[in-house]
Amino acid sequence: MKEPIFTGAGVAIITPMNQDGSVNYDEFAKFIDFQIENGTDAIVVCGTTGESSTLRVVEHNEAIKWCVKYVNGRVPVVAGTGSNSTACAIEISKEACEAGADAILLVTPYYNKTSQRGLIAHYTAIHDATDKPIILYNVPSRTGLNIAPETAYELSKLPRVNGIKEASGNLEQVAKIRELCGDNLNIWSGNDDQIYDIMELGGKGVISVLSNICPQETHDIVQTYLDGNKEESKKLMDKYMKLAKAMFVDVNPIPVKEAVNLIGFNAGPCRLPLIEMDDKNKAYVKETMKEYGLIK
């Protein structure tokens, strides 16, 4: 059995930006404090929502190092360190481990279109070059590559492969991973609209976009389930379903950055090639947030 890095809701945290595109660390600090004070169980930095794909390597390493230092052990920090280049992923992962991240989150290599055997070789190389727990990240809608359940099983044999962030949307696949791996591979939902469903399949929680604006509520969806109150967990899931889906009316993290700006933080713009939402989607996000009482 592998103890999970965290249970509950880890926020896939945005990276606040200044208007010139540089990282706004003053606002980042305020936003991390808000997250921790409102129930977030882990900070997942430099993931998809943190715009890792548009950070230069030096910025990526700096953001992780700064985040670990600022969080200062208050909650676990999981650092997104994946790349489609194994060598690059190893380089960033080593930096994150040396900085003191509690775990590293490794997205599947994108664009290269490797095989399942190639995936095993990729993750094994990173595992052997680092010394911290690893969370696999399966998001085929973005990468074009799915981690098959049998591949997840093979990777679960590596001692520091702690779990998988499952964002395939395929619950049958999640069930198969659970069947093959049991407690040797922890599962976190990578989709906010599937938190309850994945908890039902043995999940430990969620790595969440929604937590950026509703940290306590997202934590509560998971925690009520873990406490044995499945009915309340399901009610909360149903209640926040519309809001969770509103965060994906455009490409993540465009809507959630808009939402974070609306609740009073200076999230700033996304970096190119991501651009702001059109007026229709902006209005929808704003009206949905009003429905939930997040803004007036």
What are these regions (language model features)?
Residues 101-103, 110-204:
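Ligand/cofactor pocket segment of small-molecule handling proteins
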Residues 25, 29-32, 149, 282-289:
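Short, amphipathic alpha-helical "lid/cap" segments that border enzyme active or binding sites
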Residues 28, 60, 64, 89, ...:
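A general structural signal for well-ordered alpha-helical segments in protein cores
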Residues 2-11, 15-144:
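Active-site beta->alpha loop and helix N-cap motifs at the rims of alpha/beta catalytic domains
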Residues 81-84, 168-172, 190-193, 213, ...:
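Short beta->alpha linker loops
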Residues 193-296:
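Structured C-terminal cap/extension of enzyme domains
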Residues 47, 108-109, 167-168, 191-192, ...:
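Short secondary-structure boundary segments
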Residues 64-72, 94-97, 127-128, 156, ...:
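Surface-exposed amphipathic alpha-helices with a cationic face
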